Amino acid sequence: MLTEPELPPDINRMSSKRPASPYGEADGEVAMATSRQKMEDEGSDGLPAFHLPLHVGFPSKPHSEEFQAVSLLTQESCDRRSPSYQLNSMELDCNKMSAFALHNVATSPMKAEEVGRQSGDSLSNSMLGTPERRKGSLADVVDTLKQRKMEELIKSEPEETPTIEKLLSKDWKDKLLAMGSGNLADVKGTPESLAEKERQLMTMINQLTSLREQLLAAHDEQKKLAASQIEKQRQQMELAKQQQEQIARQQQQLLQQQHKINLLQQQIQVQGQLPPLMIPVFPPDQRTLAAAAAAQQGFLIPPGFSYKPGCSDPYPLQLIPTTMAAAAAATPGLAPLQLQQLYAAQLAAMQVSPGAKLPGVPQNNLSNSISPSSVHTDKSTSSPPPKSKDDVAQPLNLSAKPKGSDSRSSSSPTSPHIQRLSSGSTHKPISSTSASTPIRLNSIDILSSLTSPGYLNDHDAVTKAIHEARQMKEQLRREQQALDGKVVNSLGLNNCRTEKDKSSLDALTQQLTGKPNEDKFSHAMMDFNLSGDSDGSAGISESRIYREARGRGSNEPHIKRPMNAFMVWAKDERRKILQAFPDMHNSNISKILGSRWKSMTNLEKQPYYEEQARLSKQHLEKYPDYKYKPRPKRTCLVDGKKLRIGEYKAIMRSRRQGQQTQIPISTAGVVYPGAIAMAGMPSPHLPSEHSSVSSSPEPGMPVIQSTYGIKQEELHIKEEIRGDNINGEMYDEYDEEDDPDIDYGSDSENPSATQAN
């Protein structure tokens, strides 16, 4: 008798576990129910029923074969009822089970211990032939069959073939799989075939190695190409950056050059617009000394001029200062105000009538030789020359004696000086009579004494004379302010009907006054020398009109203000209104445009605000240092009261209408010197409809002055400026002819009509 081998406890513990099937349980449950039904039918005959734990279902064909085998086995066991036959059958089953176990060990090495346990159980069951033992042995047989079927199914499952298996031959792959499954005995082949397979495998390995090297080389090339592209891009970016920096430097240099050019142009304009400082004729023995003194004091000597003592050329020496700085260097003790007053005094000396006798001037200084400038002035009566910078900068000779001065009266309307005024020549003196006041004659005496040769090298005397001239000027100014409120019947101003007359008056004002160099003295000044009453008694009244040059210095060019949204819109609208109504005044047009603009919606105004932003940006790029300097509103001083232009015009209109019927008949044929001086000229800054029809006397003309750049003692006017600026609105509705010189062109600015918010 065989004894049951001792098994480890681990194996016994593992034997109680049955493998779970990876497949569904539907077919297994059907098979189990069928087998149970058959067992119960057979158990009714007195046979023991075998309950097979078929929990795993297989595909149809393997399951049917297995079930048939199990059915045959149970049938045979039921037919043979003898104990001996049962024992033999159990031994046969044990042998079969052992064979199955051996095959299972060959196919699945990992289940050797379990197979040993099953064989031990089968041996113990053979020793004990009880129905329970037989039932357990049948269950083990069924489990073994199921395990075998599972192994076959696992082998038959399609596996994902790796990449290397695609490159191998089919027979070699089958042999590898057979070797991997443990069937070493099934591998068939000779050493030659094995060597061939090994050679093929080495060839394949070499091919894979070469392919790997090619891939690595291609990857390296791609890396190098990408690195080269990145380097090229970096170089291009650096080159573009350098080009941008170079362009920026060039633009900066261009801006600097443009700035220098603008400064030079401003200096040239200042030099061309300064009135010349004139020094009279010197005797031949003093020319060398005068040239040396002029060279030391910064004067410009005309090139090619001979300074030999024996030189007797007919043209006198004329010394011209190049700039205001040269004149200041010539007289270092003078302030800018004194230099300006010196120029004004010389201009006043030029305006003396030819018939007036100048006391204090030596008679030998009035030479009979005529300078080219005076000849040119006399020729201007018949053929006036064109205006240019050279003509403006050409000096006058005070020592030249005009022709026919004794035979003609200063009050004659056919005086050549009146023709000079109307012809637009550069030299337009304003005449005066011999009945001038002693104050005016004294100032002229001082100014004429400055022209004597003795004062050339005597700096103290020149300074003293200039100081006296300044005192005379201040005294005249105080007297004029005292006489502002009085009515003077000796003033006669012609009508101002055309724009041509206005332009000629502006040209006359610029030529007579010049343009000073300092900003605080930037306003122009015109002096009208009036004398004589209706009865011939001596009297004087001086009226001044101060005009402000848009709040900037003479050396600074005017920069137009960028148009705002209203001006952009009003440019075309104004043109349309003028086409429909050519005679409509600008003030009425501005009022109409202002009311229309206020009635527009924000959506309608939007494109004009966008255009304003574009123009502002363009203006800022073109003029980065631009600063808006508005022109203050003008005021009038009438009888010691400050009045606006509209109020002044209303007062003058009422006075003129009340006095037109009171003109004496005896004065109808009297021509006043003031009227002679302004014959053919428009009245400055007076509207045409407000001037008198004839040269009738008019009440005292007040001082019309700008409130910008006034002297320090006139603080009350500055307070009015601040009040006017506070009251500024977006649309300044001014009276008629309030600002007649405003340019209403499409490209010009209109600071008085519209104020920016």
UniProtKB/Swiss-Prot annotation:
Residues 730-746 have a biased composition (Acidic residues). Gene3D superfamilies: High mobility group box domain (1.10.30.10). SMART domains: HMG. One of its GO terms (molecular function) is DNA-binding transcription factor activity, RNA polymerase II-specific. Residues 1-48, 113-137, 359-436, 719-757 are annotated as: Disordered. PROSITE patterns: HMG_BOX_2. The keyword Transcription regulation applies. Transmembrane segments: none annotated. It holds the Pfam family HMG_box. Keywords: Coiled coil, Differentiation, DNA-binding, Nucleus, Transcription, Transcription regulation. Expressed in migrating myoblasts during ventral body wall formation. Residues 457-489 form a coiled coil. Its main location: nucleus. Residues 559-627 bind DNA. One of its GO terms (biological process) is cell fate commitment. Residues 119-128, 362-375, 420-436 have a biased composition (Polar residues). GO terms for cellular component: nucleus. It is found in: Nucleus. Residues 399-416 have a biased composition (Low complexity). PANTHER family: FI18025P1, TRANSCRIPTION FACTOR SOX-5. Transcription factor involved in chondrocytes differentiation and cartilage formation. Specifically binds the 5'-AACAAT-3' DNA motif present in enhancers and super-enhancers and promotes expression of genes important for chondrogenesis. Required for overt chondrogenesis when condensed prechondrocytes differentiate into early stage chondrocytes: sox5 and sox6 cooperatively bind with sox9 on active enhancers and super-enhancers associated with cartilage-specific genes, and thereby potentiate sox9's ability to transactivate. This is Transcription factor Sox-5. The gene is sox5.
